[in-house]
């Protein structure tokens, strides 16, 4: 019999953070770096825990080179060849601590990932990425990768509920990607009717992960620096961004003009565009679950990085958190009916 869960679930747009008394004199005093030791790999990582999504428009080597300068992380998309990786490792050895190799859950994916990790042993992060992290096959794949790479830190997802977070952590994953359908170019919710409001998903999944000394990534749903702050406030250890990093010089694809405006393409990894490019088209048994959009060309990503980090520091000063680590402890969310004044939007 169908069941209705009557508990209210909230998204970033449904809340604001309540300001609190603060002893901080300036945003400059806020420390955004975090240090994590991961449950299964036992590896330690230090940096600003914002990750560029492993989408082939934004998760590029060019993006990783800039992100690394800010101690930020990039999940490199899975469509680079072994030779591409070797060239990147030769030209940018300083970036290799701040990138992950991405893989699907197929045999070909595993073989390609293995060859990359053997050729570039400095890379210690693996991102196992499937649209539906609830399949038994994926859980078994995580166990297989953990057995094969016992000292690599494994990110795995995507899921949105605590019981699956726990299962993936106990199967060998260190960091669980949380989010089904919130992305700016994702249409899973409209095509399938499946999803979970991102703020509630993060709060619930963080609680489950932290109880096992695991970690989570809030993946998708951020439209502005304030949403990034809300994700951290909700308990996310890392926040993964795709759309907010789209349209920059460091993104894949050419700049083109339409009606006098400079634009770049940005598309979901389950879109017609991505499947035509990488899988020879959309298989007849499935539907596209992503969209392709033309986004304004924004120039170098440096300004966007500074805007996000500046907003995050400002959030911390408003709630009295001297470190990003303290933000979730200082966060009180209030439900609202309006986010901001829209007169000049």
UniProtKB/Swiss-Prot annotation:
Active-site positions on this chain: 186 (thioimidate intermediate), 188 (proton donor/acceptor)
Q: What is its EC number?
A: 1.7.1.7
Which GO BP terms, alphabetically? purine nucleobase metabolic process; purine nucleotide metabolic process; response to cold
Q: Which UniProt keywords apply?
A: Metal-binding, NADP, Oxidoreductase, Potassium, Purine metabolism
Tell me the PROSITE patterns matching this sequence: IMP_DH_GMP_RED
One Pfam entry for this protein is IMPDH
Residues annotated for NADP(+) binding in this entry:
26-27, 78, 129-131, 180-181, 269, 285-286, 314-317
List the catalytic activities from the record: IMP + NH4(+) + NADP(+) = GMP + NADPH + 2 H(+)
Q: Give the GO cellular component terms, alphabetically.
A: cytosol; GMP reductase complex
The lineage's top-level taxon is Eukaryota
List of residues binding GMP: 219-221, 242-243, 268-270, 286-290
Q: What CDD domains does the database record attribute to this sequence?
A: IMPDH
MF GO annotations = GMP reductase activity; metal ion binding
Q: For binding K(+), which residues are annotated in this chain's numbering?
A: 181, 183, 186, 189
Please give the InterPro entries that the UniProt record associates with this protein. Aldolase_TIM, GMP_reductase, GMPR, IMP_DH/GMP_Rdtase_CS, IMP_DH_GMPRt
Q: Quote the SMART domains the UniProt record gives.
A: IMPDH
Per the record, the similarity remark reads: Belongs to the IMPDH/GMPR family. GuaC type 1 subfamily.
Purpose: Catalyzes the irreversible NADPH-dependent deamination of GMP to IMP. It functions in the conversion of nucleobase, nucleoside and nucleotide derivatives of G to A nucleotides, and in maintaining the intracellular balance of A and G nucleotides.
Subunit field text: Homotetramer.
Checking NCBIfam families in the record gives: GMP_reduct_1, PRK05096.1
Q: What is this protein called?
A: GMP reductase 1
The species this protein belongs to is Homo sapiens (Human)
């Amino acid at each position: 019999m169908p069941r209705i869960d009557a508990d209210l679930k909230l998204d970033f747009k449904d809340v604001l953070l309540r300001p609190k008394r603060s002893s901080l004199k300036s945003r400059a005093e806020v420390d955004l770096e975090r240090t994590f030791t991961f449950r299964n790999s036992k590896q330690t990582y230090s940096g600003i825990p914002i990750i560029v999504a492993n989408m082939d428009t934004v998760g590029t080597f060019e993006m990783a080179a800039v992100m690394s300068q800010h101690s930020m992380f990039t999940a490199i998309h899975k469509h680079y060849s072994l030779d591409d990786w070797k060239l990147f490792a030769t030209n940018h050895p300083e970036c290799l601590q701040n990138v992950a190799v991405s893989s699907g859950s197929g045999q070909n994916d595993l073989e390609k990932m293995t060859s990359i990790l053997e050729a570039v042993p400095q890379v210690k992060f693996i991102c196992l990425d499937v649209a539906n992290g609830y399949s038994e096959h994926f859980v078994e794949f995580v166990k297989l990768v953990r057995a094969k790479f016992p000292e690599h830190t494994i990110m795995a997802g995507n899921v949105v509920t605590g019981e699956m977070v726990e299962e993936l952590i106990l199967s060998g994953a260190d960091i669980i990607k949380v989010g089904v359908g919130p992305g700016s170019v994702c249409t899973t919710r409209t095509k399938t009717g499946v999803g979970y409001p991102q703020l509630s998903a993060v709060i619930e999944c963080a609680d489950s992960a932290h109880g096992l000394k695991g970690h989570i990534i809030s993946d998708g749903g951020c439209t502005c620096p304030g949403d990034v702050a809300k994700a951290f406030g909700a308990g996310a250890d890392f926040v993964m961004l795709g759309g907010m990093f789209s349209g920059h010089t460091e993104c894949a694809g050419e700049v083109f003009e339409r009606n006098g405006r400079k634009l770049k393409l940005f598309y979901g990894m389950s879109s017609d565009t991505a499947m035509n490019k990488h899988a020879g088209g959309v298989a007849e048994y499935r539907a596209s679950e992503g969209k392709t959009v033309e986004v304004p060309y924004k120039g170098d990503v440096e300004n966007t990085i500074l805007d996000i980090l500046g907003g995050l520091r400002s959030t911390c000063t408003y709630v009295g958190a001297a470190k990003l680590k303290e933000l979730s402890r200082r966060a009180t969310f209030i439900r609202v009916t309006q986010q901001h004044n829209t007169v000049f939007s």
